[in-house]
């Protein structure tokens, strides 16, 4: 599926970037021998419990509010199958393939801890889905934290439901048969293991980290272009001044801005034209930097969850000396809070970008042609793109409202506090897509302002960014259909290669 090297889970701490390599870029996923040994050990504990006829939640009892109902014999496998079927009740549009793949990756990471007790054939089945390009169709809505999304993945292992396969949506059984894969046989606890834990929110949050990290860098680049187009006063980014407020993110952003703007004749010619700039351009290090610090915090929280055992119950010890512990590790409060916090940062990045681009089209403050076009009146220019950005920024303010505090009660009072972590991760993904489009609009407007200010020399990095955009989007001379221009700019912001080219132009981009 990919030329990337295989990713191996199980021999050490996982990085969120490894999950992204598999889910988004198609790297093959494997488990280490040590991980398989842990999985087999936990399964042996389950088999011992069943053989001894012991009472253990989810192994020999019903689930949730039915935890006091004792089961035995064939009922144990029947419970696992029924768990998947009854929990596969999500609604709405299906997740994108990369989102479902991320969830499966996070589930495999959870099982690699060797504390769940599912049969190794299920883990092999999940790896086969990833490595053979078979992606279950998983409805996006219906999770208060976990359960429904992985149930839809689980039924695909049974040959039930639909999957994305070779560019089409087909029956799961047909895709498995086409790849020579058998359906799985379920035993005690297998169904519960598949639906339990925090893989849904964690996998989705890892993708969000990838998007947020890339867009935070682009925000610095595009913010620098707007700063230059508005002839900002570079003294605000002075290294000695910035060091007096030693937040790590702020230091990185200011260093980026100085590198991007180095050699700018535009800024040299504009030195001293005003005492100080508007806050939306003067405080880029402070605003972007604070957002980067929240991103760093969220990454630590999400990566810790990726390296956690989040099933219930968890199995400790060996088949000869074991403990079965009911606890609350599937509660995803840490990921939910991290995703909510990051959504606030994303809303701030988009909000300040909208303020900057509004200044670019406003002749009262920009010193540029009204709406960045000749013959205003006949041409509306970039006027309505600012409306679009304002709409997206407004939506992101709504998406910044925390999901984690919206608690409900489920399962007849047994589950009476819920994280809403999957909802938090999904709305974060929507906010990031809005941010990408806001930044794309700012990119278009700043580049158009450069057309006005040329042939003055621009900064080393900002000139490179201008050139990258102009490879796909021509200058705006008269009114034309703008939606494709926004889409083209947004596509650039989604690419790793364009950002790498830009970073190379200045030596590094933090």
Feature annotation, model-predicted:
Residues 2-27, 31-38, 42-50, 76, ...:
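C-terminal auxiliary extensions adjacent to catalytic cores
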Residues 57-79, 86-109, 137-160, 168-169, ...:
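FAD-binding core of FAD-dependent oxidoreductases
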């Amino acid at each position: 599926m990919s030329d990337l090297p295989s990713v191996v889970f199980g021999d050490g701490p996982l990085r969120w970037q490894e999950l992204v390599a598999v889910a988004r870029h198609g790297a093959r996923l494997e488990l280490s021998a040590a991980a398989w040994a842990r999985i087999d050990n936990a399964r042996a504990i389950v088999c011992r419990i069943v053989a001894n006829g012991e009472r253990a939640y989810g192994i020999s009892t019903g689930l949730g509010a039915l935890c006091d109902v004792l089961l035995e014999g064939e009922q144990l496998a029947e419970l696992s199958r029924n768990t998947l079927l009854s929990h596969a009740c999500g609604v709405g549009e299906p997740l994108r393939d990369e989102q479902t793949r991320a969830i499966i990756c996070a589930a495999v990471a959870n099982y690699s801890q060797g504390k769940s007790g599912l049969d190794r054939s299920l883990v092999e089945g999940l790896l086969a889905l990833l490595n053979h390009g078979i992606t279950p169709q998983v409805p996006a809505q219906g999770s208060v934290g976990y359960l429904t999304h992985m149930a839809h993945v689980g039924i695909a292992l049974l040959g039930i439901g639909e999957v994305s396969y070779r560019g089409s949506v087909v029956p799961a059984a047909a895709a498995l048969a086409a790849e020579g894969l058998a359906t799985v046989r379920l035993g005690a606890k297998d169904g519960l293991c598949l639906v339990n834990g925090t893989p849904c929110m964690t996998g989705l949050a890892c993708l969000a980290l990838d998007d947020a990290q890339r867009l935070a860098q682009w925000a610095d680049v595009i913010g620098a272009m707007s700063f230059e187009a508005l002839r900002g006063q570079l003294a605000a980014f002075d290294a000695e001044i910035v060091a007096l407020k030693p937040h790590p993110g702020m230091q990185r952003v200011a260093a980026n801005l100085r590198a991007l703007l180095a050699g700018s004749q535009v800024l040299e010619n504009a030195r001293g034209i005003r005492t100080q700039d508007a806050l939306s351009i003067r405080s880029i290090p402070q605003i972007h930097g604070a957002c980067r610090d929240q991103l760093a915090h969220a990454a630590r929280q999400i990566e810790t969850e990726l390296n956690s055992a989040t099933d219930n119950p968890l199995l400790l010890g060996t088949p000869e000396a074991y403990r079965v512990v009911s606890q609350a590790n599937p509660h995803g409060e840490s990921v939910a809070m991290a995703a909510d916090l990051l959504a606030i940062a994303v809303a701030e990045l988009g909000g300040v970008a909208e303020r900057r681009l509004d200044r670019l089209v406003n002749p009262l403050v920009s010193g540029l042609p009204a709406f960045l076009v000749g013959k205003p009146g006949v041409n509306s220019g970039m006027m309505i793109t600012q409306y679009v950005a304002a709409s997206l920024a407004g939506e992101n303010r709504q998406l910044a409202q925390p999901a984690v505090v919206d608690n409900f009660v489920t399962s007849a009072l047994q589950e009476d506090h819920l994280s809403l972590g999957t909802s938090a991760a999904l709305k974060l993904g929507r906010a990031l897509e809005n941010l990408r489009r806001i930044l794309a609009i700012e990119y278009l407007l700043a580049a158009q302002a450069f057309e006005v200010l040329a042939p003055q020399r621009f900064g080393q990095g900002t000139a490179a960014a201008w050139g990258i955009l102009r490879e796909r989007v021509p200058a705006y001379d008269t009114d034309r259909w703008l939606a494709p221009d926004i889409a083209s700019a947004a596509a650039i912001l989604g690419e790793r290669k364009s950002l790498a080219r830009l970073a190379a132009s200045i030596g590094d981009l933090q």
